[in-house]
């Protein structure tokens, strides 16, 4: 992975011909080189399920932290689609049974939601769900988003913007949603001692749960705002963070009432409503809601206060600076990984093998920073 060697067969050939590789591996000039199957069988039988590659990667990250190469002052995280090594003819729709429950982003966030008025955990039930995968690599998933279309895997990675060093790598089927995965991806790094103060994400992560989850993790998030088509502001409502209330065009406050749960999706929304009879004689009542309604309500994200605080940072000098760093380091790191370190496509099959490939590529990208000579003052 350091030198772009894509297979065990080619690796064995390089060791056979390259004196430097022979010296590094401890082989004499006349020693026989082991067969390529020795490498592949050892990797799959002994190392793949041992957590060795994950532990080795985090050990390198810890050494970089100790050397001052990672400070966590500015970081960026993103997901990248990597195609699987499958043919179009192997695509197949499969029907699986999945347990449907509340959307879970982070344990601390779930605990906070459970304390809110109106919280009611939806009953867990098993539903049948169809998904597209491949007969040759059933762990992979199908994505059809923008210019990304195909069977593959999603690599979620975090990079420190001081030197562009990767601090976390996780791999999922491509059909998984990035915003549902990122908080646990970040939490795992924080538990391992990775410093994380400010984090830049793209607009795909602009959900109230992600904004609040970052606050619970002690991270200041910078996320571009999505222009939602039915936002309360579109109808003249404004949010007052001091009161945690929406103000209608007539100046009447809609206070937080309770959580509403969508039973089919497991998603929670905050219900804001007018508590008295102010709507009954309002001149704008006919245009505000239908005759069956008693008082005006507004449904917003279950973590709307944090969502609002995150949007207040949009457009600030700090926000613009973090967006520039995200474009340079997050997108740039993915480009280097795919171009120089053999993961433009996942060559092996199965999510364990895909994780192994991404971790080895990340280590190959990080090791040169750790080995580079530095001055005594760091």
Where on the chain are the PLM-derived regions?
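Anion-binding and metal-coordination hotspots
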Residues: 4-17, 26-378
């Amino acid at each position: 992975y350091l030198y772009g060697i894509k297979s065990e067969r080619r690796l064995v050939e390089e060791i056979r011909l390259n004196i430097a590789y022979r010296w590094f591996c401890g082989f004499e000039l006349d020693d026989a080189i082991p067969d390529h199957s020795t490498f592949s069988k050892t990797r799959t039988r002994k190392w793949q399920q041992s957590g060795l590659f994950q532990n080795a990667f985090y050990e390198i990250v810890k050494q970089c932290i100790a050397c001052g190469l990672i400070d966590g002052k500015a970081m960026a995280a993103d997901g990248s689609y990597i195609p699987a090594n499958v043919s179009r003819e192997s695509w197949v729709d499969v029907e699986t049974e999945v347990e449907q429950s509340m959307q879970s982003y982070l344990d601390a966030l779930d605990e906070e939601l459970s304390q809110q008025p109106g919280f009611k955990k939806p009953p867990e039930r098993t539903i049948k769900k169809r998904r597209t995968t491949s007969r040759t690599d059933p762990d992979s998933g199908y994505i059809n988003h923008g210019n990304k279309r195909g069977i593959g895997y999603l690599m979620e990675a975090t990079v420190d913007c001081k030197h562009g060093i990767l601090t976390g790598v996780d791999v999922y089927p491509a059909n998984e949603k990035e915003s549902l995965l990122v908080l646990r991806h970040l939490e795992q790094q924080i538990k391992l001692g990775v410093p994380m103060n400010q984090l830049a994400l793209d607009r795909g992560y602009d959900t109230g749960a992600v904004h609040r989850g970052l606050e619970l993790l002690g991270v200041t998030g910078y996320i571009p705002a999505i222009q939602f088509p039915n936002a309360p502001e579109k109808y003249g409502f404004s949010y007052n963070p001091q009161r945690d209330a929406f103000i209608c065009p007539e100046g009447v406050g809609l206070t937080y009432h309770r959580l509403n749960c969508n039973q089919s999706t497991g998603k929670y929304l905050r219900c804001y409503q007018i508590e008295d009879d102010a709507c009954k004689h309002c001149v704008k009542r006919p245009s505000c809601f239908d005759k069956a309604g008693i008082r005006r309500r507004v449904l917003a994200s279950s973590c709307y206060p944090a969502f609002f605080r995150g949007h207040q940072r949009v457009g600030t000098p700090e926000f613009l600076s973090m967006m520039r760093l995200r474009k340079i380091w997050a997108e740039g790191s993915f480009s280097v990984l795919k171009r120089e370190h053999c993961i433009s496509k996942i060559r092996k099959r199965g999510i364990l093998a895909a994780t192994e490939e991404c971790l080895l590529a990340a280590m190959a990208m990080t090791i040169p920073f750790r080995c580079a000579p530095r001055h005594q003052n760091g």
